[in-house]
C-alpha cells in the first residue's frame, strides 16, 4: 500500500504543464514497477501531464543500464541526444547518460559523486530551473 505521505517534488506539475504547453513530449522512466508507478502518478496528479510512462519491468535491464531511457525516448519518438533526462539519483544519471540523453541532475537523498559530474549536462536545485534550458 502506498504511504499517505507521498509528496510531489517542488515545481513538478508546473514544469510538466510548461513543457506540455510548448508541445514538448514527456515521459517518466522509472525503476519502480508498473502498478506502483501508475498508483504514484495518479496519487500525485501528474499522470495526464505525461505522454509516456515507462518502468523497469517493461525493459530487459533496469537502471543503471540504459534500457528504460532508450525505451522512453523511442516511445516519444525522439533520439536520446535530443532529450533531457531529469534525474535525482546516481543510478538514474548513469542510466540516462549511457542511453545518450542530456542529463540534468536535481539533488535529493544522494549527492552526485565527483565520478558522475562530467556526465551531467547541468545541475539545478529544483525543477523550476529546468525552464531555462528551453528558453535559451
Predicted stretch roles:
Residues 1-28, 34-38:
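Short, acidic loop-to-helix structural element flanking the phosphoryl-transfer center
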Residues 17-20, 33-136:
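Asp-based, Mg2+/Mn2+-dependent phosphohydrolase catalytic module
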